[in-house]
Amino acid sequence: MNKKEVIEAVAKVFADKISELKSSLEGTRDRARDAPGHNVSHSDTSRFQLSNLALGIEKQVVEYEEILKQIKGVALEPADKISVGSLFTLCDTDSDEEKNFLMLYQGGGEKITVDGVEITTLSITAPIAQACLGKETDDEVKYRNNTFEVTEIL
């Protein structure tokens, strides 16, 4: 795995999400501006509801922009221990199935494929991320009823 390529791919995912949200935000604002307000009809709250929706989208944009900044700031040098910014592989000791992760402060749950390898982003607050923090290559990670071995840290 090439850590730089993975970081670039994850950054693209979040940049694309930001672009989609901004487009959605623009459309929502337009609809809110054109919607009837409560002055037109006592039972119509479309403008209010659309305005609230726009505020929610704005918050998501800000969150994703913060995540994107953090992703772009991830160190490319390999670390000895798993920490925020680590790209690492866990191998299930029972099934020998390997899973690849990129640990971030925020933005967990995204699955991307780089050169045919699936990588899942982990938020540092995720229980499995907490179990992995500070582990080194060949260490065991116990999560739920499974045991994993750390096989690679980049």
Where are each of the predicted segments found?
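Non-DNA-binding regulatory cores of transcription-related proteins
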Residues: 80-142, 148
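Mixed-charge, polar/low-complexity N-terminal
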Residues: 1, 7, 29, 36, ...
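Generic preference for flexible, low-structure residues
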Residues: 30, 37, 41-44, 73, ...
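Generic hydrophobic-segment detector
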Residues: 47-48, 75, 128
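Helix-rich terminal scaffold detector
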Residues: 1-65
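Conserved hydrophobic positions within beta-strands
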Residues: 150-154
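Long amphipathic N-terminal alpha/beta scaffold segment
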Residues: 55, 59-97
